[in-house]
């Protein structure tokens, strides 16, 4: 006889979508139209374990009926609450640090108020766990290499790689450093804040009767959080910028090119209009001998290891009072990242009686605010593409646990790991490391080691507490000196009228600017020479032009004459477009900065048309187009045209795989291709007089292909990928509305054209979704001590079902921002 489950009363009048009822019915579930009861049709078994159901649900073992009922009840409750949107009742808490009150000021913003800073961080931890427990635990499992315990064998390779990095050991070292620090030091204060934050997480976990739906689906309960878990997620931030992946690509592709081809294909185009060579050149325009040797050695290392076969955009803008309507500065920031559900960030407002008064983005796992504002100042962060990681290869002697280096054979530290799998089995393997790197790959007696700054010193500021309390330019810069993880360019503005940019993070010093290549451990010239001192990092303070901006570009005014930070930068498309929009008026307001943040005009397209269109007089679309990518048909045509030009132009020199990697890894690929077409086509084995035919042919094929393409979607993907029907329930989406990887509102697909342009003559081309773009947008008006205008693309509450994302995604598409105002309080250290 079927078991009967009575659902909450609030679900009784809910109309369940027919498609969902059909899906439940196909799994042996029936649901009355009134939704007053739900039947589990499982015959006589006490376990929901029919083979067919297991396959459809993606479970490898029988699921206890009581917990399956709990899951379906949770699903029905989620369906019901979708009608009311995301809400959270005001919560009053007491802890050893004082009293704290939590509420959702809006569906996008968590508000935490307490009578001490530690009480506030306790509340922030509590609220984060209530809203994002799955995200917290998933991040912890990724960092520690424990995904396979809940996701099965499909996550094993990820776990093995993470165990090779050894982030848990680094986190424990960082924890011990802060724990042992002098009582009144910033490290000791950070430890206390993390202690309070972790206690809040565990308080919420202990009270939680209904776990996040992901935990019910995967049949597990998260463990309590330790203080070192927070430091662990801090270590994970080192890999926001995975420079080492570019080093693999750069070493492979550079060995297939002549110096001329290499400079043409991988040059940096500065904001000021010059080309910066990707590797050091001598006076004749050839590579230095050190570069030649490094290229050959790097390729040799990849061949030994069997790896010889063959990104992001953000903006920060600060405008001084001389160019604003109020006479006070404005600051806008919009970090770009992968579109995920839930968002990597949680917007929070933190207020305490001890002077903490800040609003902005919180990275779940560590207390505090990373990007935001207080009553005195505002700040935003942008990745600088810094080369703060290196790949080294060397000869191994694992029997004697040694590696060959420039200093002779050095001992390796050996650790044996056991990864528990979801099916009850385990996987054992061995990791090796030494002071200069973690062994991430080994083959034929050679190893690849990854080095990053935390191996030298895993400590550092991960809570940004001093930044949250900064009051002026000097205290702002002081607050950044202890930040060591992923290097950033930080934009700044304050109520005193100051604006500026400051680089932060640990960046290695090197003999030569060749950190973007895989290097040999036996070469003394490849060893790190310490780190660039903070006061030598690029910065800009109160420029005469009245504004400062950074959009991942190479600006000669910032970087020329400084220690080399990278060989890879974004093109100046966004920075030049932003600059042009800033120069439209000297009366900027929150509204004008909103328009800049949401701008989808392709600056590069506007420039490229002047060269390309004379070759195709038959064109009727692009000649009338102003570059606004919201005209999807015209924008798509230009994109596909450049994709076909890239494929055709490079086809005689680079294989298909390398061409795919190039368009994916190199942000300035369109600028480089245009430059080659204009000046260097013969260097790529094409006759000069073949240029007109090549451009026309690619236009014709692009026109046909672009007209066949289905309208793409923008997707916010969940980490649970299988079964497919479940992933669809957990993925938010909306129709693509313009933007590309070079517009201010940047969005992108990865290596899209080579996988989408091969459809048959009469078939439509299915386009990949756009899965990268702005994570949130903040604008701070310094004329008002507390005003912050904000917008984020997923709600604070981390419910994964797509129907609960609709309201927030609709606001995101429409650019519908909300405003919050901090209390008019003074910091306790004024």
PLM-predicted stretches and their roles:
Residues 643-724:
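Charged, long alpha-helical assembly modules
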Residues 48-55, 60-87:
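Amphipathic terminal alpha-helices
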Residues 89-330, 335, 341:
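Substrate-recognition/specificity elements adjacent to catalytic centers across diverse enzyme folds
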Residues 352-368, 372-377, 381-522:
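Glycine- and hydrophobic-rich flexible loops that cap the catalytic core of alpha/beta enzyme folds
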Residues 485-585, 643-646:
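Hydrophobic alpha-helical segments
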Residues 2-43, 81:
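Terminal hydrophobic/aromatic helix or amphipathic segment near a protein terminus
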Residues 564-617, 695-830:
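Terminal end segments
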Residues 157, 174, 198-199, 454-478, ...:
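Proteins synthesized as precursors that undergo proteolytic processing into mature forms
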């Amino acid at each position: 006889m079927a078991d009967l489950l009575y659902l909450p009363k609030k679900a009784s009048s809910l109309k369940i979508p027919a498609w969902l009822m059909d899906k439940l019915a196909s799994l042996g579930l029936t649901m009355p139209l009134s939704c007053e009861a739900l039947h589990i049709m499982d015959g006589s078994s006490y376990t929901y374990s029919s083979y067919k159901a297991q396959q459809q649900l993606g479970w490898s073992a029988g699921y206890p009926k009581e917990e399956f009922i709990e899951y379906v009840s949770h699903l029905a409750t989620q369906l019901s609450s979708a009608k009311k949107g995301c809400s959270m009742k005001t919560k009053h808490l007491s802890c050893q640090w004082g009293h704290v009150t939590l509420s959702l000021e809006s569906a996008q913003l968590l508000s935490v108020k307490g009578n001490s800073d530690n009480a506030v961080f306790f509340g922030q931890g509590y609220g984060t766990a209530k809203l994002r427990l799955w995200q917290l635990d998933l991040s912890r499992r990724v960092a520690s290499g424990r995904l396979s315990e809940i996701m099965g064998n499909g996550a094993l390779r990820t776990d093995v790689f993470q165990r090779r990095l050894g982030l848990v050991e680094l986190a424990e070292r960082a924890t011990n450093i802060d724990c042992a620090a002098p009582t009144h030091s910033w490290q000791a204060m950070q430890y206390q804040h993390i202690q309070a934050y972790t206690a809040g997480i565990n308080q919420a976990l202990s009270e939680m009767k209904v776990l996040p739906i992901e935990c019910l689906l995967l049949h597990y309960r998260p463990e309590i959080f330790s203080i070192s878990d927070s430091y662990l997620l801090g270590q994970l931030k080192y890999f926001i910028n995975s420079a080492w992946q570019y080093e693999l690509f750069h070493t492979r592709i550079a060995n297939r090119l002549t110096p001329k081809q290499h400079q043409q294909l991988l040059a940096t185009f500065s904001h000021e209009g010059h080309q910066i060579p990707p590797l050091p050149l001598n006076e004749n325009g050839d590579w230095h001998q050190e570069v030649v040797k490094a290229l050959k050695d790097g390729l040799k290392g990849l061949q030994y290891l069997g790896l010889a076969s063959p990104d992001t955009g953000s903006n920060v803008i600060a405008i001084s009072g001389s160019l604003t309507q109020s006479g006070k500065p404005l600051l806008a920031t919009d970090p770009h990242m992968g579109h995920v559900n839930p968002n990597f960030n949680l917007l929070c407002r933190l207020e305490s009686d001890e002077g903490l008064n800040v609003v902005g983005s919180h990275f779940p796992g560590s207390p505090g605010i990373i990007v935001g504002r207080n009553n005195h100042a505002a700040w935003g962060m942008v990745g600088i593409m810094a080369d703060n990681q290196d790949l080294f290869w060397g000869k191994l002697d694992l029997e004697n646990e040694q590696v060959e280096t420039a200093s002779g054979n050095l001992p390796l530290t050996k650790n044996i790991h056991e990864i528990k799998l979801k099916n009850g089995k385990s996987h054992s393997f061995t990791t090796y490391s030494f002071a200069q790197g973690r062994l991430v790959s080994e083959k034929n007696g050679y190893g690849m080691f990854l080095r990053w700054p935390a191996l030298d010193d895993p400590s550092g500021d991960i809570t940004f507490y001093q930044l949250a309390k900064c009051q002026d330019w000097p205290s702002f810069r002081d607050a950044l000196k202890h930040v060591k993880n992923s290097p950033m360019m930080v934009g700044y503005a304050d109520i005193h009228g100051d604006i500026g940019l400051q680089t932060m993070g640990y960046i290695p010093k090197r003999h030569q600017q060749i950190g973007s290549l895989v290097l040999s451990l036996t070469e003394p010239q490849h060893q790190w020479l310490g780190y660039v001192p903070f006061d030598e990092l690029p910065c800009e303070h109160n420029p005469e032009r009245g504004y400062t901006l950074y959009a991942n570009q190479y600006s000669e005014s910032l970087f020329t004459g400084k220690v080399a930070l990278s060989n890879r930068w974004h093109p100046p498309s966004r920075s030049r477009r932003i600059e042009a929009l800033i120069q439209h008026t000297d009366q900027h307001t929150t509204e004008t900065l909103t328009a800049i943040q949401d701008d989808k005009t392709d600056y590069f397209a506007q420039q490229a048309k002047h060269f390309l269109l004379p070759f195709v007089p038959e064109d009727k679309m692009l000649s009338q187009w102003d570059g606004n990518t919201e005209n999807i048909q015209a924008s798509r045509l230009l994109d596909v045209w450049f994709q076909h030009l890239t494929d055709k132009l490079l086809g005689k020199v680079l294989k298909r795989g390398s061409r795919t990697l190039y368009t994916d890894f190199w942000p300035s690929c369109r600028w480089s291709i245009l430059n080659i077409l204009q000046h260097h086509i013969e260097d790529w084995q094409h006759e000069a007089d073949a240029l007109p035919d090549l451009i026309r042919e690619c236009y014709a094929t692009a026109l046909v292909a672009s007209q066949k393409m289905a309208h793409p979607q923008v997707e916010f993907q969940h980490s649970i990928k299988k079964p497919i029907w479940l992933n669809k329930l957990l993925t938010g989406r909306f129709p693509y509305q313009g933007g590309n990887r070079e517009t201010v509102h940047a969005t992108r697909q990865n290596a899209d054209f080579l996988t989408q342009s091969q459809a048959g003559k009469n078939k439509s081309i299915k386009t990949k979704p756009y899965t990268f773009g702005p994570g949130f947008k903040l604008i701070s008006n310094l004329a008002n001590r507390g005003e912050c205008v904000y917008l984020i693309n997923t709600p604070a509450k981390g419910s994964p079902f797509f129907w609960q994302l609709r309201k927030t995604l609709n606001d995101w598409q429409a650019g519908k921002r909300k405003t919050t105002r901090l209390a008019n309080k003074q910091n306790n250290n004024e």
